[in-house]
């Protein structure tokens, strides 16, 4: 029995031993003492898969670890890092030395100078990335290795390594980056790793080491490549306690004096190149060209098509190094597919056959070029500026003919001093402007602008855009389909907009000091013409416009012209519509009520080289120059719901933002606005100044009526409800315009009716002339004429003729406008007598006066009968009598008065000429860290052994136990 008990005891001991062995295989735990020092070594000589046993150190605040890498061709270099004092995590440094493994080069800055290190890799890592560099004391693991293309570049802390493509300033951190901070100790002050001059394929990373970095989540790569999102590389900061230690973080910096691109997937090349290994980028690899503060050419070498993805620059605008690097032998810049997010200046002519985009905040300055061609997409969300730095230059040829020309930012060209005509051609497949396009072209010889059909919800501004010599000029659209204008078009400094095809929408055309020429007025719909100064609205008599064209600010000084003989002119005082008739065609303009019907007249002249009839007004200027048409809404929709009645239809404003029939309620109710988008502008109409809403969101009045206020414009002749909005909502005030007329010009005009007779009969025409500017004293006198009837008899009989002679000049002191004297002259000849009216121009004067002139020459007629052998003939002899004095009164027409309408609206622009700082853009690619599995290879083998023991060994042990028990 005792023997059996001994056997049973031995069997139980065997079972317990087996169970202990199985438990060891099934658990993956290891017990590591706190505050221990662990050394980890790995080899990487030619190894594709490296098995390394890396023990997990418990997280404590004072752990110092040393990581040593042994390579095939260099001595061991190890360094230990002082513990971090500012973080509970342990900051460690990975020291690297030796030669490149599998062609990958990771740039590592070490606390101590690593001499002759042309390429360094992180210890604990291999080219295959199968093992991970573990930060001692950190909970972050599994960081993938850094794999870069094989260019020999390295940076020693505090010094420039021979053969390096760029020198990193030790201790400097990238501008705008989340700077690598030294914690606890300063390791040679190196806080940035530079990878430059290399073309990245697959992935790239740089590891900062040699400094104790605590809490920093970025490695600053000055002029280095950011990791491609699909690559496995990462920017890892050794000693970082951040879980983002595997993140790919790229930031532009100021190291080496260059600013790098922050665009993901771009390769930034520094000011110098290494053995030509990085001078060109292979097709399909995106690269960037930085605008460097240094004078070195950026990305010197060949830039092949399709390799350029972005052009950036530092915040401080530098010289056009990009243009040098992109220039051809003839000085022309051939721009590949490009996105511009910084401040770039290209000097010289530019040809772009691939898409070019200026991102929001980006700025592209085209300087001193004679020719610009954009034959692919041209997208402008930022700003494009055409500028000249020379005192003399020829006019620019600018051609945009790609598929899309989309402007939501600013396009501005300034070249008024050009010695030859500027020529801008905007003929893309799709032309959409929601921003601001402004062209100030050649002044000496007016510039030409050609447009394809456009969609405009922003602003066009043209100065000096016209052709001389009477040909069709200005902004011309040559296409079958029409344009849509829901914004503003401003014409000044003699600019003429020739509208050949249909224009629709609800926009405004402001004639500031230019002209608008409509060839087909019936297809010019929904637009409001606003006179803001002197100019002409001209219409071709090709068709009758069924809807009157709304015209704001017509005074007669700014004229309406018809390029055909006008046979009748009428004004409806009830509707405010002025109608000109030419044959069977009629042309009507809604100029507003308040004009005098007797003040209108027609005069002849020329416009754009063609004979034209001007519709003039010489009466009192209407107190309201607003059109009565309801088709004057501009820029935005005015909507009402329910049966709301409106007491004032406020239409046709002078606001620079938008014009139109802004609807206001007839009841003085308080408007409640929800989340308004508001800004106000001050409108000046004659002497009435009002602050009105330019933009206000959906509004509900006290009666429950919901409508949208977009622009409210006061009418000077009616009581209008003007709504203003601020942070507290929308409010109602009432303003009544009181100005009837205001003379703002010293110019005056004299109108004379002239009757001209010829073989076809007599025609009566009205001639209007401009009086000279007022002077204080002018000595002059009108010419006067005396008419005498003379009867002349000869062998053929007697004829009566009328002789008109000029009276001598008289002298008087007067200030008067130009005047005219009309005399009726009867002329008789062999065919009979005809009566003609002769009108002559009086000298200048500026006020009404009565003048005393010397008497005109007069004649005495005597009848003489002469007889000879043939008989008697009766002849009449006329002789001059002495001069007498007479009084001639010259009365000038009363000068015209005008009302000037000015407005000054505030203009909100969200994207103008903002300069993008390259350091402000940070692209981050991160992936979550996974817990470390220790002894990974052993676990796989252990689980295999345990699986076998589970079935076989356990059965054998049970059998031994039974035998021992029964024996």
UniProtKB/Swiss-Prot annotation:
Pfam families xref list: Hyphal_reg_CWP
Lipidation positions, renumbered (GPI-anchor amidated alanine): 946
Propeptide segment residues: 947-967
Disulfide bonds: none
Sequence repeat spans: 93-105, 106-118, 119-131, 132-144, 153-165, 166-178, 179-191, 192-204, 205-217, 218-230, 234-247, 248-259, 266-278, 745-780, 781-815, 816-854, 855-893, 894-902
Stretch forming the signal peptide: 1-23
Record's bilayer topology term: Lipid-anchor; GPI-anchor
Annotated region described as 13 X approximate repeats, Ser-rich, given as residue ranges: 93-278
Subcellular location: Secreted, Cell wall; Membrane
Glycosylation site residues: 28, 35, 493, 601, 638
Positions of the UniProt region annotated as 4.5 X approximate tandem repeats, Thr-rich: 745-902
Entry comment on modification after translation: The GPI-anchor is attached to the protein in the endoplasmic reticulum and serves to target the protein to the cell surface. There, the glucosamine-inositol phospholipid moiety is cleaved off and the GPI-modified mannoprotein is covalently attached via its lipidless GPI glycan remnant to the 1,6-beta-glucan of the outer cell wall layer.
One GO biological process term: fungal-type cell wall organization
Biotechnological applications listed in the UniProt record: Probable mannoprotein called haze protective factor from wine that is able to prevent visible wine protein haze formation. This mannoprotein showed haze-protective activity against wine proteins and BSA when either was heated in white wine.
Alphabetical UniProt keywords: Cell wall, Cell wall biogenesis/degradation, Glycoprotein, GPI-anchor, Lipoprotein, Membrane, Repeat, Secreted, Signal
Taxonomy, superkingdom: Eukaryota
GO CC field: cell periphery; extracellular region; fungal-type cell wall; side of membrane
Region (Disordered): 72-301, 836-857
Role summary: Involved in cell wall organization and biosynthesis.
UniProt family annotation: Belongs to the SRP1/TIP1 family.
Record remark: domains: The number of the intragenic tandem repeats varies between different S.cerevisiae strains.
The name this protein goes by in its record: Haze protective factor 1
Source species taxonomy: Eukaryota, Fungi, Dikarya, Ascomycota, Saccharomycotina
Gene: HPF1
């Amino acid at each position: 029995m005792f023997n059996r008990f001994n056997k049973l005891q031995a069997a139980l001991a065997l079972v317990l031993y087996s169970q202990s062995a199985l438990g060891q295989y099934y658990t993956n735990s290891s017990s590591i003492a706190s505050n221990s020092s662990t050394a980890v070594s790995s080899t990487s000589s030619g190894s594709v898969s490296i098995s390394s046993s890396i023990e997990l150190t418990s997280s404590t605040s004072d752990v110092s670890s040393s990581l040593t890498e042994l390579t095939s061709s260099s001595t061991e270099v190890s360094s230990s890092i002082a513990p971090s004092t500012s973080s509970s995590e342990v900051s460690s440094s990975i020291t690297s030395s030796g030669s490149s493994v599998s062609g990958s080069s990771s740039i590592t800055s070490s606390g101590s100078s690593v001499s002759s290190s042309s390429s360094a890799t992180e210890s604990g890592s291999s080219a295959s990335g199968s093992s991970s560099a573990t930060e001692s004391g950190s909970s972050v693991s599994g960081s993938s290795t850094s794999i870069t293309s094989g260019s020999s570049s390295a940076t020693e802390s505090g010094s420039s390594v021979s053969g390096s493509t760029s020198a990193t300033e030790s201790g400097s951190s990238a501008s705008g980056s989340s700077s690598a901070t030294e914690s606890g100790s300063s390791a040679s002050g190196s806080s940035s790793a530079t990878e430059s001059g290399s073309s990245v394929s697959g992935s790239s990373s740089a590891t900062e080491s040699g400094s104790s970095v605590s809490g920093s989540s970025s490695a600053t790569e000055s002029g280095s490549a950011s990791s491609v999102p699909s690559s496995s590389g990462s920017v890892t900061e050794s000693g970082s306690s951040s879980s983002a230690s595997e993140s790919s973080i790229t930031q532009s910096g100021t190291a080496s004096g260059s600013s790098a691109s922050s665009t993901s997937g771009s390769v930034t090349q520094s000011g110098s190149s290494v053995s030509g290994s990085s001078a060109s980028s292979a097709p399909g690899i995106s690269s960037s060209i930085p605008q460097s503060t240094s004078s070195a050419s950026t990305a010197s070498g060949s830039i092949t098509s399709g390799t350029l993805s972005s052009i950036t620059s530092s915040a401080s605008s530098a010289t056009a190094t990009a243009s040098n690097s992109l220039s051809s032998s003839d000085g022309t810049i051939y721009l590949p597919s490009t996105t511009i997010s910084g401040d770039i200046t290209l000097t010289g002519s530019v040809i772009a056959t691939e898409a070019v985009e200026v991102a929001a905040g980006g700025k592209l300055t085209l300087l001193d070029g004679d020719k610009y061609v954009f034959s692919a997409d041209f997208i402008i969300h930022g700003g494009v500026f055409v500028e000249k730095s020379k005192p003399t230059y020829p006019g620019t040829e600018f051609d945009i003919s790609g598929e899309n020309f989309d402007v939501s930012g600013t396009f501005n060209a300034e070249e008024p001093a050009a010695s030859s005509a500027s020529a801008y051609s905007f003929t893309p497949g799709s032309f959409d402007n929601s921003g601001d396009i402004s062209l100030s072209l050649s002044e000496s010889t007016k510039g030409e602008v050609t447009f394809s059909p456009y969609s405009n919800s922003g602003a066009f501004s043209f100065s000096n855009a016209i052709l001389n010599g009477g040909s069709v000029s200005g902004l011309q659209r040559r296409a079958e389909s029409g344009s849509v204008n829901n914004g503003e078009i401003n014409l000044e400094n003699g600019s003429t907009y020739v509208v050949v095809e249909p224009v629709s929408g609800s926009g405004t055309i402001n004639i500031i000091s230019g002209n608008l020429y409509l060839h087909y007025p019936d297809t010019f719909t929904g637009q409001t013409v606003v006179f803001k100064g002197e100019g002409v609205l001209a219409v071709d008599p090709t068709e009758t416009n069924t809807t009157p064209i709304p015209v704001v600010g017509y005074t007669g000084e700014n004229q309406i012209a018809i390029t055909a003989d006008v046979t009748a002119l009428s004004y409806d005082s009830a509707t405010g519509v002025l109608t000109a008739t030419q044959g069977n065609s009629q042309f009507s303009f809604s100029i507003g009520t308040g004009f005098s019907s007797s003040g209108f007249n027609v005069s002849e002249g020329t416009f754009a080289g063609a004979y034209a009839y001007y519709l003039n007004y010489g009466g009192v200027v209407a107190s309201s120059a607003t059109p009565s048409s309801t088709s004057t809404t501009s820029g935005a929709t005015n909507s009402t719901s329910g049966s709301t009645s409106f007491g004032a239809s406020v239409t046709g404003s002078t606001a620079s933002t938008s014009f139109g029939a802004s609807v206001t309620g007839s009841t003085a109710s308080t408007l409640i606005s929800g989340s308004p988008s508001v800004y106000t502008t001050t409108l000046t109409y004659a002497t009435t100044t009002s602050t009105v809403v330019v933009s206000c969101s959906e509004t509900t009045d006290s009666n429950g009526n919901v409508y949208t206020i977009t622009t409210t414009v006061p009418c000077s002749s009616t009581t209008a409800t003007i709504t203003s909005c601020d942070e507290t909502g929308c409010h109602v005030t009432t303003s009544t315009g009181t100005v009837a007329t205001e003379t703002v010009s010293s110019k005056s005009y004299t109108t004379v009716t002239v009757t001209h007779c010829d073989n076809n009969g007599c025609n009566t025409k009205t001639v209007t002339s401009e009086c000279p500017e007022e002077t204080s004293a002018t000595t002059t006198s009108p010419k006067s004429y005396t008419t005498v009837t003379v009867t002349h008899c000869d062998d053929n009989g007697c004829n009566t003729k009328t002789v008109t002679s000029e009276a001598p000049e008289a002298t008087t002191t007067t200030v008067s406008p130009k005047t005219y004297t009309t005399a009726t002259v009867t002329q008789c000849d062999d065919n009979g007598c005809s009566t003609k009216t002769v009108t002559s121009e009086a000298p200048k004067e500026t006020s009404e006066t009565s003048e005393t002139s010397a008497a005109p020459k007069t004649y005495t007629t005597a009848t003489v009968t002469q007889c000879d052998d043939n008989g008697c003939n009766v002849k009449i002899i006329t002789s001059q009598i002495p001069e007498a004095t007479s009084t001639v009164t010259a009365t000038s027409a009363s000068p015209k008065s005008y009302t000037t309408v000015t407005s000054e609206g505030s203009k909100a622009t969200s994207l103008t000429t903002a300069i993008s700082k390259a350091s402000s853009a940070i692209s981050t690619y991160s992936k979550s860290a996974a817990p470390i599995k220790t002894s990974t290879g052993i676990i796989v083998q252990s689980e295999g052994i345990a699986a076998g023991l589970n079935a076989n060994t356990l059965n054998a042990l049970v059998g031994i136990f039974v035998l021992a028990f029964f024996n």
